[in-house]
């Protein structure tokens, strides 16, 4: 059963009317209602607030990394473990083919259903997850395979055990090593891009965001609690933080925005997966045709956060 957000109530009502028309066999009513539905969808989704985009990024039906992997990766083989401590189910690593091109895919997976969410730690990786990702990145480099990374996490797991095993070191090591990988790397934020937990697999030649995803240094709720000591200020925090793809593209922090199907990726997972596949293939071709892609990656990373300070007269 489809889950509708509060701002989608009119869409839900029209959809229910369409289903009733189908039961009655009333094709004329169905056609009229479908046109009305299309108009309503365009009106709502062309005027979304940043808070509503955050709701879409966290939608329980939104495609996760495993959904996309199952749809676009063929002849896939999952790789486990970090060769140091354990296998972190919050990060998945696969070898396979996208359109007959051998690739390595690394993704953050939140899981569906209570049992699976607990197994995946709600998509919050431990250090062994980031070390597993680095192990696979080095494997890809050794065998000259391009890397696709799918980012979707509220953040790195903040537990005591994670800190004892070097959470910050694991993330920092990934930032360092991914920056110098000698193979094409493409990272896509498919839902939530939460702070260092996202950055650990977001250093790439090209960093893209799905249309209704977010990327931030802290959750808006956390920001509201720290700055205003008031959770009701979440919407104010979102505006101030500039966490949407459009804001981040304007700031030069991401390279591309991947458009989603009408009503969001959760309403048409196959279409969303095909869009990601085409983006990956097109971007990969562009990177492979550039003999200086490593230099360009380095220049891009070094330019992040740079600014010019005017001297007082």
UniProtKB/Swiss-Prot annotation:
Its EC number is 2.1.3.15. The keyword Repressor does not apply. It catalyses: N(6)-carboxybiotinyl-L-lysyl-[protein] + acetyl-CoA = N(6)-biotinyl-L-lysyl-[protein] + malonyl-CoA. One of its GO terms (biological process) is malonyl-CoA biosynthetic process. Keywords: ATP-binding, Cytoplasm, Fatty acid biosynthesis, Fatty acid metabolism, Lipid biosynthesis, Lipid metabolism, Nucleotide-binding, Transferase. Pathway: Lipid metabolism; malonyl-CoA biosynthesis; malonyl-CoA from acetyl-CoA: step 1/1. It is found in: Cytoplasm. Residues 36-286 form the CoA carboxyltransferase C-terminal domain. PROSITE patterns: COA_CT_CTER. One of its GO terms (molecular function) is ATP binding. InterPro entries: Acetyl_CoA_COase_a_su (IPR001095), ClpP/crotonase-like_dom_sf (IPR029045), COA_CT_C (IPR011763). It comes from the Bacteria. It is an enzyme of class 2 (transferase). GO terms for cellular component: acetyl-CoA carboxylase complex. Acetyl-CoA carboxylase is a heterohexamer composed of biotin carboxyl carrier protein (AccB), biotin carboxylase (AccC) and two subunits each of ACCase subunit alpha (AccA) and ACCase subunit beta (AccD). Belongs to the AccA family. Component of the acetyl coenzyme A carboxylase (ACC) complex. First, biotin carboxylase catalyzes the carboxylation of biotin on its carrier protein (BCCP) and then the CO(2) group is transferred by the carboxyltransferase to acetyl-CoA to form malonyl-CoA. This is Acetyl-coenzyme A carboxylase carboxyl transferase subunit alpha.
């Amino acid at each position: 059963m489809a889950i509708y957000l509060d701002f989608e109530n009119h869409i839900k009502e029209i959809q229910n009317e369409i289903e009733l028309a189908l039961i009655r066999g009333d094709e004329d009513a169905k056609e009229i209602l479908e046109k009305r539905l299309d108009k309503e969808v365009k009106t709502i989704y062309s005027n979304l607030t940043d808070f509503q985009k955050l709701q879409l990024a966290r939608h329980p039906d939104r495609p996760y990394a495993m959904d996309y992997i199952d749809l676009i990766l063929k002849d896939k083989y999952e790789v486990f473990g970090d060769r140091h401590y354990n296998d972190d189910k919050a990060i998945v690593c696969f070898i396979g083919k996208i359109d007959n091109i051998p690739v390595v895919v690394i993704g953050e997976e939140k899981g569906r259903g209570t049992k699976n969410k607990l197994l995946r730690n709600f998509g919050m990786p431990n250090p062994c997850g980031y070390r597993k990702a680095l192990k696979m990145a080095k494997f890809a480099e050794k065998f000259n395979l391009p890397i696709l990374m799918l980012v979707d996490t509220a953040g790195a797991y903040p537990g005591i055990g994670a800190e004892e095993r070097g959470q910050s070191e694991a993330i920092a090591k990934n930032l360092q090593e991914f920056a110098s990988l000698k193979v094409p790397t493409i990272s896509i934020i498919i839902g939530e891009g939460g702070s260092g937990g996202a950055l650990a697999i977001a250093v790439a030649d090209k960093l893209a965001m799905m249309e209704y995803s977010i990327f931030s240094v802290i959750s808006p709720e956390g920001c509201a609690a720290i700055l205003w000591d008031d959770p009701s200020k979440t919407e104010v925090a979102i505006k101030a933080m500039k966490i949407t793809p459009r804001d981040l593209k304007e700031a030069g922090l991401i390279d591309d925005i991947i458009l989603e199907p009408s009503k969001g990726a959760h309403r048409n997972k196959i279409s969303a997966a095909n869009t990601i596949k085409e983006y990956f293939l097109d971007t990969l071709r562009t990177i492979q045709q550039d003999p200086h892609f490593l230099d360009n990656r380095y220049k891009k990373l070094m330019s992040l956060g740079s600014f010019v300070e005017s001297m007082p007269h």
